[in-house]
Amino acid sequence: MKPNNLSFWMQSLDMSPYSASSDPALLLPSYQCDVAIIGGGFSGLWLAYYLKLAQPETKIALFEAQHIGYGASGRNGGWLSSNIPSVINNLLKHPSITPAQIQLLQRQVINTIDVVDDVCQQEQIDCDLHKGGLLFIATNEAQIERLQHYHESELAYGFAEHELNMLSAAESQQHINIPSMVAALHYQHGARIHPAKLALGLRERLLGMGVAIFENTPVRAFSKNHLDLGKSTVQADKILCCTEGYSDQILHNRKIIPVNSSIIMTKPLPESFWQRFGWQNNELLGDVAHLYIYAQKTRDNRILFGGRGAPYQYNSVDAGVGQLDGNTTQQLYQRLGELFPDTVFEIDRAWKGSLGVTRDWNPSVSYSAEQGLGFIYGFGGNGVGPTNLAARTIVDKICGRYTELTALPWNDYQCPTWEPEPFRWLGIQSMYKMLAAADKLEYGLKLKKSAFFAGTAYKICGLD
């Protein structure tokens, strides 16, 4: 059975040791477990993994509406990254959150890259993980100013000086020979992965540990100790909701909305391409345009290239199976060609996915022992690493342990709600139109600073 998801990652699993097909576990009309986890993405998978390690006798069941890795965890850019700028910037606005807490969060996110790598080695999960670092590039002077600001902010809130380097054009092109690049910020910490291999590898390990996994089993509603599956009911001492961009379908509280990100994947590129453009260290690649791109060089010498495209659908409609429109595909192809000129790329696959965004772009990790209810959500497209950290955090909370993780500023964080429609749609569409105009103005007029109205656009949707 092919996965109901159009991403290259999921569709390529037939060529890997993992299989996206599954035989759902038998679910009786009434089922009982100690812990029920809703959502089969990275948050739910990591949570089941660490909880089973901490409490081997606990009966854990994971419920997924589609198949493991159906959502963003099987569609993302494969960035196991140390970079969480929007989270840091927005947490700084809260007087109750100290700089020391923010620095601790950043250090934990950095350390999580090694944590994930260690688990993959211990559990023999081959997910193409390669630690090549991260390169954010600038292609005009306004973007150089933003890179310098990022550099200063990162050093102030958690990064050590040796972990970051501002690079000139010549220094940058020693990493990747992009002709239009005028500067770059290089991060020592960053790794590319094949996200679907990680998700399905975790699934395989969880089954071996005795975790029950129910795929194609949507949860319609839940309350204390009770899950409603339509034809079945589940009684559980603890219920943990890990549904990210799909959360509003079950929570109906406007805390989180699905924002789409779009990706194209090239066919494998010849050695002559890599001799010309470099990229020998396999760095993650991004830029600091307002409508930014992200990319990776895959193990088999493809380029994954992503951006926002059509970011938000009215009334929080999610990305479905990931069918990407031709206009967005063409926009991404054009931008790819601008960075790597005089190259004809063959596109193997194009898709989109829904990431989860809160009103202030801050994630939240919460657990109430009294209610037996927990929630992980709001990574805003930066969840490949932080979901692992969030899972370890909530396991500490469940086990009653007071640790560095339970002191992180996202613990029990209360996100504001999004506006109702049509105001939500109007605001998001306005933001993206203004950011597109800001990029165009910065290039066209060769501005030395960010376009003045870009800040207004960020404020509209809580990014500034």
Regions found by a protein language model. Name each.
Residues 2-4, 16, 86-93, 118-132, ...:
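Flavin (FAD/FMN) cofactor-binding and adjacent substrate-gating region
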Residues 78-80, 123-129, 219-221, 233-272, ...:
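Active-site substrate-recognition segment that forms the wall
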